[in-house]
Amino acid sequence: MGFQRARSAEQRQERRETIMAAAAGMLGEMPVAALTLSELSRRVGLAKSNVLRYFESREEVLLEVLMRSATACIVELDEAWAAEVLGDAALPERIEAFAAVYARVAAAHPDLLDLVSAQASVLERNVSTEAIVRFKRAALAGLDTLSSVITRAIPELGDDAPVVGSLMLTLSGAVYAQAEQSRLCESAYLVDPALAVFRVELVPALQSAVATVIAGTLAR
């Protein structure tokens, strides 16, 4: 069957959902850098020109996938923290525990971390102003939800929770990128063990970064 254009808003949304689902599935198989519009089109059985009827670019597809994945991850973080039952613990203990939970949950979503690491440098570069506005508005709503989770864990942060949340997301992408590069450099560490000082392990590095941001913000 040849391409049939969606005739209603519902059909158009269904086609968009199909494209986003295919992109999300591909991210489980390959890094963001390897995901091309050509391969995405092949996976959904459409010509590239037809995919571009629903999204203006590969980058817009991935921004949409990023936000959906982030939303689900924040819900997972909230549930994981609630299961810790540490509301009455001392502040230092809660900081370390929350950082550990965040690092564990985030590390379970490498596709999301890859998207976050590419957001500013790649994904926001080939989209229209309208697409950026939609993404930023959705990101603002997501940050508000994340801030609520952070506040439940560390109420002492008060109005600084959104700032901490934003820094946590930025650090997540950066630490992931370093951890991936470190993994690829493992052979160099074997040649010269002294270079292993540059090895970055995702979970402990992310936990340390998040705990430092929270503690540092409270100390300012």
Labelled PLM ranges:
Residues M1-P31, S38-R42, V85-G87:
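Basic, helix-initiating cap at the start of DNA-binding domains
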Residues D144-R152, E156, A174-R220:
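C-terminal peripheral helix-coil segments that are non-catalytic and often amphipathic
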Residues C73, P92-D114, A196-R220:
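N-terminal hydrophobic signal/anchor transmembrane helix of membrane proteins
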Residues E14, T18-G25, R43, E60-A83, ...:
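Alpha-helical structural segments
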Residues L123-I154, P162, P204:
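Amphipathic alpha-helical packing segments from all-alpha helical-bundle domains
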Residues E64, E79-L112, V164-M168:
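Hydrophobic alpha-helical connector segments
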Residues A106-E130, R183-A188:
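Amphipathic alpha-helical segments used for helix-helix packing
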Residues A33-E60, E64:
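Helix-turn-helix
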